[in-house]
Amino acid sequence: MSLWSDLGADLRAKQRLYSTPEQVYPLLRTVLADGTLANVLYRIQAMLVRWHLGPLALIPHWFNKVLNGCVIGVYAQFGPGLVLIHPVGVVVNSAVRGGRNVWIESSVVIGENRGQFPVLGDDIFIGSGAKVIGGVNIGTGARVGANAVVLHDVAPGDTVVGIPAKPLPRRA
């Protein structure tokens, strides 16, 4: 993917938050919202990595850390539709792989444990303060509740909560 197509998908995904009748200028609101600058800096970082300019990717990485309090590893990969709702305190390891339409709230940690790294499917939501640690797979359509600590795989479509995270019963 390209910088513009990924960033466009990110903004369209985020715009869904602001597409209500009372929002006169949802695109402007989206561009000025918390997390948009973090998304832009991450996408520039990812573009530089794709162009084999990894050392230069440290520049937007640094700006993201300083301006947004958000650390997304230089080699972390996310598909289009990434939404950083409130980026402060977000830490993502460089080896993490995420699919399309991953939504991340504030103070989320997605990181390594004993050389193992998480893999996130498509259409994932990770709530504020959640921790996703080690070689876990988060299935497509899964939701991780606020402050959950995920140490084991999450099945597609499941919602997990708690410490350690356990799935909620599915609604009939």
Show the residue positions of the predicted features.
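Left-handed beta-helix
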Residues: 68, 73-74, 79-80, 85-94, ...
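Terminal amphipathic alpha-helical/low-complexity segments used for targeting or macromolecular assembly
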Residues: 1-68, 172
